[in-house]
Every structure is written in C-alpha cells, then in structure tokens.
Regions:
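Non-catalytic interaction/Regulatory regions outside core domains
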Residues: 1-123
Length: 123
C-alpha cells in the first residue's frame, strides 16, 4: 500500500477511521469493510472543532512543565480516538475497543514520520 492512509489501515484491523486536518483542509477516510458507530457529520465537526480544541488545551498544559505533548487518546463509549498533533493541524485515528491505542502509539508515530507527517508542539 502506497499511501499513509492505506499504511495506517494496514497496521491493524482495529483502525477504523483516519482523518487528516492540515492548514484548514480536512480529509476523512473510513475503513470500507466496517460500519461506524458515528455519523460522518459528527466526525466532520469532531475533526474541525473538538480535536483541535483538545490538542490546544492539552498542548498548553504540556508546555508548562510536562515536557510537551506527544498525543492524546480519548475513550468514547464505542471506540478510542488517537489524536496526534501534526504541522498545521492533526491526524486522528479511531481504534476499535478491541485495541489498545497506547500500545500502537509508537508504530503510528513512526509510520507518520516515515511519510513525513511531522509533529507540532512535541518537545
């Protein structure tokens, strides 16, 4: 698989959804072979409003005296949301509940860096 989206889906079947929000441009990708517990409209607003706000707040706190911010994981009722700050925005990956997104974090970050998706605010 040649694209970063395909590579993320190839990591584990537990990756259900991938979104890139960069410089005001949003691209959302759903694994084609599964249903999603959320609507694409709510996902759209999550990527535009919720995830940037979470990263801003956690990043500001992380930069005070915590050594920065690497990523955030949110545990919703039906899935986990892994949010990685990236230049000009973020990458968001939904994992099924069968996965532990923290256990996948290093693999995800390495993959993103291999595709030159660079972190923002990491110290």
């Amino acid at each position: 698989m040649d694209t970063v989206v395909d590579a993320l889906f190839d990591l584990t079947p537990a990756v259900r959804y991938v979104a890139f929000y960069q410089d005001g441009d949003l691209h959302m990708h759903k694994r084609p072979d599964i249903g999603m517990p959320t609507t694409s409209e709510s996902d759209h607003y999550e990527e535009l409003l919720v995830n940037p706000t979470i990263l801003t707040l956690a990043g500001k706190r992380g930069n005070i005296d915590c050594g920065g911010l690497e990523y955030v994981v949110v545990r919703y009722g039906n899935f986990y949301q892994f949010i990685f700050p990236a230049g000009g925005g973020h990458v968001s990956i939904a994992f099924g509940l069968e996965a532990n997104p923290v256990a996948w974090a290093d693999s995800v970050i390495d993959l993103l860096r291999n595709y030159r998706v660079t972190p923002k605010g990491v110290h």
